[in-house]
A protein has these predicted regions:
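Secondary-structure junction motif
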Residues: 178-179, 193-214, 280-289, 295-308
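A short LG(V/I)-centered, amphipathic sequence patch enriched
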Residues: 41-61
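Central regulatory/effector-binding core of bacterial HTH transcription factors
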Residues: 88, 92-154, 217, 223-224
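N-terminal short secondary-structure element
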Residues: 1-31, 36
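A late-sequence structural motif
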Residues: 107, 258-301
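Beta-alpha-beta core module
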Residues: 155-161, 165-166, 188, 228-277
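Hydrophobic hinge/microswitch elements
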Residues: 130-143, 149, 202-259, 314-315
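Acidic, Gly/Pro-rich loop/turn segments at junctions of secondary structure
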Residues: 118, 129-192, 245-251, 266
Length: 316
């Protein structure tokens, strides 16, 4: 038995038993993945996966039990690698933050500035992605902290702390007819071509839910991953734009006006996520404390390091 075999078991569950995706995630070949699975099953004398021909459909009962153990072993192995750093150098290193464009561009600058004043020898790496990509980076230990409005708070492998709540607002040209409607309604917005975020990011689900509750179908002609792209196409006259309220910027909005839509769409929460049970350097805890003064380092540590093996659920 070896770590690669355990990684394959864990990744198979994460990738819905698609061995091609498992091989891609672990930078190996599909034949190599299949060989490792066969060798581990032969060594243990059990069937780990439910099969139909060569296709994996799920996990057997022994396989489910093995998955929980594999997750614990791999997480502890990661902690061992971090242990030396924790005790030898706690004021320098690299802090990797996986976040969405909106948070990287509009919410994090002041926090990062304050963090650098406290830890001038820590280098920061910002990785921008979707909430799903951010969660995967946390799962794999490729990011220390994940920041997003979607996905992080309902992942049993992660611990998520609230940062702040934010609403959407509507961007339109100064002379647009919607500027004359008070209060703004979903019915009036639905009459115009709409530009907003793509599925799965920056509160898009709140937008879709609001229109669905009214039995309306928004005419979303263009969806994008970040606010700046949305603003660009609104400025070109392609449509009106629904964006995060905190994404304001005078230069890119000089020919646009923002309209309040807090009464139309539910507010969103930005979450700070960490991998459950993973040791961290002190500056990781302090970064979270800078984001949310209501959190103490002791409380963050306690929640992150709580035993949660029974909560791991890969939909098996």
């Amino acid at each position: 038995m070896n770590f690669q075999q355990l990684k394959i078991i864990r990744e198979a569950a994460r990738q819905d038993y698609n061995l091609t995706e498992v091989a891609n995630m672990l930078f190996t070949s599909q034949s190599g993945v299949s060989r490792h699975i066969r060798e581990l099953e032969d060594e243990l004398g059990i069937e780990i996966f439910v099969r139909r021909g060569k296709r994996l459909l799920g996990m057997t009962e022994p396989g489910k039990a093995l998955l929980v153990i594999a997750e614990r072993i791999l997480n502890e192995a990661s902690n061992v690698r971090r242990l030396a750093d924790l005790f030898t150098n706690d004021t320098s290193g690299v802090l990797t933050i996986a976040t969405t464009h909106t948070q990287a561009r509009y919410s994090l600058p002041e926090v990062i500035k304050a963090f650098r004043e406290l830890f001038p020898e820590v280098r920061l790496e910002l990785i921008q992605g979707t909430p799903q990509e951010i969660a995967t980076l946390l799962h794999n230990g490729e990011a220390d902290i994940g920041i997003a409005s979607e996905r992080l708070s309902n992942d049993p492998q992660l611990v998520a702390f609230p940062w702040f709540r934010w609403p959407h607002s509507l961007l339109v040209p100064h002379d647009h007819p919607l500027t004359q409607i008070t209060p703004l309604t979903l019915e009036s917005i639905a009459k115009w071509p709409l530009i907003t975020y793509r599925q799965g990011i920056t509160g898009r689900s709140r937008i879709d839910d609001a229109f669905a509750r009214k039995g309306l179908l928004a005419d979303i002609i263009l969806s994008a991953q970040d606010s700046d792209v949305i603003k660009t196409y609104v400025a070109l006259g392609l449509g009106i734009g629904l964006v995060a309220e905190q994404s304001s910027g005078e230069q890119e909005e000089k020919n646009l006006i923002r309209l309040d839509t807090r009464h139309l769409f539910d507010a969103n929460t930005v979450w700070l996520g960490l991998k459950r049970g993973q040791l961290q350097r002190n500056y990781v805890w302090r970064f979270l404390e800078l984001c949310n003064a209501g959190l103490s380092v002791e409380d963050i540590k306690r929640q992150v390091m709580e035993n949660s093996e029974e909560e791991i659920d890969y939909q098996i």
